[in-house]
Design a protein with these regions (language model features):
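Predominantly flavin-linked oxidoreductase catalytic cores and closely associated redox partners
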Residues: 111-163
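Glycine-rich FAD pyrophosphate-binding loop
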Residues: 9, 25-45
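Short, mixed charged/polar active-site loops
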Residues: 3, 76, 81-83, 144-147
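Conserved Rossmann-like nucleotide-cofactor binding loop
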Residues: 16, 39, 160
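Beta1/beta-strand and adjacent pyrophosphate-binding region of the FAD-binding site
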Residues: 2-16
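Conserved N-terminal glycine-rich FAD pyrophosphate-binding loop of Rossmann-like flavoproteins
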Residues: 37-60
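Small-residue (primarily alanine) positions within well-ordered alpha-helices
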Residues: 16, 20-25, 112
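A conserved beta-strand/loop capping segment in the N-terminal third of enzymes
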Residues: 54-107
């Protein structure tokens, strides 16, 4: 197996991994992202976006045209109900949104690819270690196996990741 060289290898193609890939690829770095799931996967309870998340997506120039905007929060505890507006800051909008996670992930994955990141789906990747130093990743099996050396390896595998 030949060793390939990239500036950045990312383990995990969710919002954190793809956001990092978008920024790095737009800056001209060579980026490869390994996502063990399919392109545009769904995630339970992943549809809600806070104003902070919307601000981050705006910075990445991810359009939210079909999102359902929400202007506040409703908290229910027993018979008590309390409604609050989102706090307003200069950095974040004064609204949240509901956007199906499948659409969010698809938009971010597509933006990373459009920026120049190489996106690899349905392939698990694990770090290559030299003592306590990460050299890159190994991914895939058999004829699809790849060995990547990277100047920086980002682990964004989420809560269920093996890393």
């Amino acid at each position: 197996m030949n060793t390939e060289q990239y500036d950045i290898a990312v383990i995990g193609g969710g919002p954190a991994g793809t956001a990092a890939a978008i920024r790095a690829a737009r800056a001209g770095l060579s980026v490869i992202v390994f996502e063990k799931g399919k392109h545009g996967r769904d995630k339970v309870c992943g549809d809600g976006l806070t104003p902070r998340a919307i601000g981050a997506l705006n910075e990445l120039e991810i359009p939210l045209d079909d999102a359902h905007y929400i202007k506040g929060l409703r908290m229910i505890a027993g018979k008590r109900v309390r409604e609050l507006d989102w706090p307003t800051t200069e950095r974040f909008p004064n609204h949240g949104a509901v956007w199906p996670r499948r659409r969010l992930d698809t938009a971010l994955m597509d933006a990373a690819a459009a920026a120049g990141a190489e996106m690899i789906y349905e392939t698990e990747a694990l770090p290559i270690m030299d003592g306590d130093k990460v050299l890159g990743v190994e991914a895939g099996v058999g004829p699809n196996a790849r060995k990547i050396h990277a100047g920086l390896t980002i682990v964004a595998a989420g809560a269920v990741g093996k890393v």
